[in-house]
């Protein structure tokens, strides 16, 4: 009877219920904590497993990247070997006339760059002999290095322009004739060293002009003296001979000194080597009027308009452009160093080709 009385008291029943609730919550919390600890341990174990796998994958990736670097190095080595072997293959086709490509060159900021670019063009041309003539008292190791690396059959010469005929850095290109001594040095070399040659073509190619490989095929067609259009020259998009219906030359479209016997650029013609060998006095001169270097040379070879051969699909295509590398804008101090060829740091010297 006593317990029933106690239970009849509502507050006692509520207290007992509350105690039971808190006890249940305590057991639940303890179980939950134990469960979380187990989950944490499981998760930590999983993380450790994944970390080990990640380390393993990272090691594999590193090994594969290292192998890739090795393979890339091997590919480059093989490419180099292939290029070297190809360069050593015979470049001479006896049925194809040789081109004697004469390039006068002088020291300037872009000389090394221009000759490097030109060497890559000429390296694609078989049966070509590159005659490079420096405007200097001695041969430059930098230019010799370009010629050696090009694997092009070549002759390296030098001829100094007289001081009274040399232009200052800021002089316009047309102030004085350029390449006179250098072209003559090359012509004399041809006359002395190639006197027994029966076939071949002589061409004067500036080191900063642009050449389509097709122009070399046109040169090989020359029987006497060939002529073709030249782009970006003489204040025009194209300078070209104008032909009659029968294919002979009527006149030229030049606007600068059109009265010249041959109002064309040096890049516009090539001559058979037999003409050079049989006309030893056909040389260039400082004593001709400005713009008459080409005309005087061709006339001294006995060339006339009527016996020139229009090439490049009867002068309807342009395969050579008289491009010019722009002079860099330099300070007076830099121009002075360039003129004296001194005072360069090692990187500048390498860029300019004075690092020997």
Curated annotation (Swiss-Prot):
Localization per Swiss-Prot or TrEMBL: Membrane
Family annotation (InterPro entries): Glyco_trans_43, Nucleotide-diphossugar_trans
Catalytic activity line of the entry: 3-O-(beta-D-galactosyl-(1->3)-beta-D-galactosyl-(1->4)-beta-D-xylosyl)-L-seryl-[protein] + UDP-alpha-D-glucuronate = 3-O-(beta-D-GlcA-(1->3)-beta-D-Gal-(1->3)-beta-D-Gal-(1->4)-beta-D-Xyl)-L-seryl-[protein] + UDP + H(+)
Topology, Lumenal side: 31-356
Its membrane topology: Single-pass type II membrane protein
Disruption phenotype: F1 adults accumulate eggs in the uterus. Embryos are predominantly arrested at the bean/comma embryonic stage.
Active-site residue numbers: 294 (proton acceptor)
UniProt binding sites for Mn(2+): 208
A Pfam family annotated for this UniProt entry: Glyco_transf_43
Known EC number: 2.4.1.135
One Gene Ontology cellular component annotation held by this UniProt entry: Golgi membrane
The keyword Methyltransferase is assigned to this record: no
RNA-binding among keywords: no
Predominant location: membrane
Keywords attached to this entry: Glycoprotein, Glycosyltransferase, Manganese, Membrane, Metal-binding, Signal-anchor, Transferase, Transmembrane, Transmembrane helix
Any single biological process term in GO: egg-laying behavior
GO molecular function: galactosylgalactosylxylosylprotein 3-beta-glucuronosyltransferase activity; glucuronosyltransferase activity; metal ion binding
Spans within the Cytoplasmic topological domain: 1-9
Record-stated family: Belongs to the glycosyltransferase 43 family.
Function: Glycosyltransferase required for the biosynthesis of the tetrasaccharide (GlcA-Gal-Gal-Xyl-)Ser core linker of heparan sulfate and chondroitin sulfate. May be involved in the biosynthesis of the HNK-1 carbohydrate epitope on glycoproteins. Required for embryonic development. Involved in the elongation of the pharyngeal isthmus during the later stages of embryonic development. Involved in vulval epithelium invagination.
UniProt-listed PANTHER family: GALACTOSYLGALACTOSYLXYLOSYLPROTEIN 3-BETA-GLUCURONOSYLTRANSFERASE 3, GALACTOSYLGALACTOSYLXYLOSYLPROTEIN 3-BETA-GLUCURONOSYLTRANSFERASE BETA-1,3-GLUCURONYLTRANSFERASE
Protein name: Galactosylgalactosylxylosylprotein 3-beta-glucuronosyltransferase sqv-8
Organism, as annotated: Caenorhabditis elegans
Phylogenetic lineage: Eukaryota, Metazoa, Ecdysozoa, Nematoda, Chromadorea
Gene: sqv-8
């Amino acid at each position: 009877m006593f317990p029933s009385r106690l239970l009849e008291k509502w507050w006692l029943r509520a207290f007992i219920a509350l105690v039971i609730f808190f006890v249940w919550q305590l057991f639940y919390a303890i179980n939950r904590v134990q469960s979380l600890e187990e989950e944490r341990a499981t998760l930590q174990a999983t993380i450790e497993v994944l970390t080990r796998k990640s380390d393993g994958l990272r090691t594999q990736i590193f090994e594969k990247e290292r192998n890739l670097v090795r393979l890339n190095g091997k590919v480059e080595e093989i490419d180099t070997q292939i290029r070297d072997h190809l360069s050593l293959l015979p470049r001479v086709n006896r049925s194809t006339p040789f081109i004697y490509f004469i390039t006068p060159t002088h020291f300037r900021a872009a000389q090394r760059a221009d000759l490097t670019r030109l060497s890559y063009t000429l390296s694609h041309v078989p049966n070509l002999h590159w005659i490079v003539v420096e405007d200097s008292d001695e041969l430059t190791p930098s230019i010799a290095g370009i010629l050696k690396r090009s694997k092009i059959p070549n002759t390296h010469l030098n001829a100094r322009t007289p001081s009274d005929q040399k232009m200052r850095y800021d002089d316009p290109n047309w102030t004085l004739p350029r390449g006179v001594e250098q072209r003559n040095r090359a012509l004399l070399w041809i006359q002395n060293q190639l006197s027994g040659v029966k076939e071949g073509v002589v061409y004067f190619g500036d080191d900063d002009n642009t050449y389509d490989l097709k122009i070399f095929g046109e040169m090989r067609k020359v029987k006497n003296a060939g002529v073709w259009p030249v782009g970006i020259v003489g204040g025009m998009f194209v300078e070209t001979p104008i032909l009659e219906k029968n294919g002979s030359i009527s006149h030229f479209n030049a606007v600068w000194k059109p009265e010249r016997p041959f109002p064309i650029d040096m890049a516009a013609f090539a001559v058979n080597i037999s003409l050079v060998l049989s006309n030893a006095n056909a040389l260039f001169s400082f004593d001709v009027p400005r713009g008459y270097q080409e005309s005087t040379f061709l006339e001294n070879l006995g060339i006339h308009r009527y016996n020139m051969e229009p090439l490049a699909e009867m002068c309807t295509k342009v395969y050579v452009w008289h491009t010019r590398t722009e002079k860099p804008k330099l300070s007076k101090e830099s121009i002075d160093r360039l003129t004296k060829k001194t005072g360069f740091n090692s990187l500048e010297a390498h860029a300019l080709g004075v690092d020997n």
